[in-house]
């Protein structure tokens, strides 16, 4: 159960980080 939760958290972090990189890239930061 803990490993499954950890997996979902990791996916969420990577997904959020990817979107942040795209947004910052478009803003010229």
From Swiss-Prot:
Topological type in the membrane: Single-pass membrane protein
Subcellular location: Cellular thylakoid membrane
InterPro entries recorded: Cytochr_b6-f_cplx_su8_sf, Cytochrome_b6-f_cplx_su8
Principal location listed in the UniProt entry: membrane
Sequence intervals crossing the membrane: 3-23
A GO CC annotation given for this chain: cytochrome b6f complex
UniProt GO BP: cytochrome complex assembly; photosynthesis
Keyword Transport belongs to the record: yes
Keywords, sorted A to Z: Electron transport, Membrane, Photosynthesis, Thylakoid, Transmembrane, Transmembrane helix, Transport
Oligomer status and interactors: The 4 large subunits of the cytochrome b6-f complex are cytochrome b6, subunit IV (17 kDa polypeptide, PetD), cytochrome f and the Rieske protein, while the 4 small subunits are PetG, PetL, PetM and PetN. The complex functions as a dimer.
Main function: Component of the cytochrome b6-f complex, which mediates electron transfer between photosystem II (PSII) and photosystem I (PSI), cyclic electron flow around PSI, and state transitions.
Family: Belongs to the PetN family.
Protein name: Cytochrome b6-f complex subunit 8
Species whose genome carries this gene: Nostoc punctiforme (strain ATCC 29133 / PCC 73102)
């Amino acid at each position: 159960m803990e490993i499954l939760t950890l997996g979902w958290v990791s996916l969420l972090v990577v997904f959020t980080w990817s979107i942040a990189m795209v947004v910052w890239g478009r803003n010229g930061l």
